[in-house]
Amino acid sequence: MPKRILTLFICLLALSLSSFAAPKKSAKKAASNGSAPDKAYMQKIWDGWSTLNTANVEQYYATGPHTFFDIAPLKYNSWEEYEKGVTAILKNYKSGKFTVNDDVELHHHGDLSWGTATVKEDAILSDGKREMGTWRYTVVFENQAGKWLIVHEHVSVPAH
């Protein structure tokens, strides 16, 4: 019996000491990075798009030379270009609702996160026609000054 107690004591001591050896995240670094993007953050972005007003999503996009692919045209080379092009397209809609589905996959590595999901679209065109579909969504976020911004995005509709 005493050998068991001694063995148990040594095991508990080893476990306790090993917890001190584990690297700790700096509280300052963790706070400056904010929370990594998750499904809720992605939905917040799409809720902004549901307003059909680019001013409500601008805060999520990095400025400067970044590539964004949307349903049309082929590509945009910056947020400024994207905003101008999408604003013209959004004028054709009365309302929109975009829901990020449960198939979200997110991967985090330092100041970068990338993810994929499908997004349910339910929109009403200016002529009253209802448009419904499921879109593919790929996004790359970069942590810039503590804020996770989109530096690359791809939205597409599967071919029928």
Predicted regions and their residues:
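N-terminal export/membrane-targeting signals
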Residues: 1-22
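Short, low-complexity N-terminal intrinsically disordered segments enriched in polar/charged residues
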Residues: 21-63
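A solvent-exposed, acidic/Ser-Thr-rich amphipathic alpha-helical stretch
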Residues: 36, 54-109, 132
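A short, structured loop/turn motif at beta-sheet edges
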Residues: 106-113, 141-147
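A short hydrophobic beta-strand element
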Residues: 111-121
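Beta-strand elements of well-folded, non-transmembrane domains
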Residues: 121-125, 141
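Short beta-strand edge/turn micro-motifs at domain boundaries
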Residues: 134-159
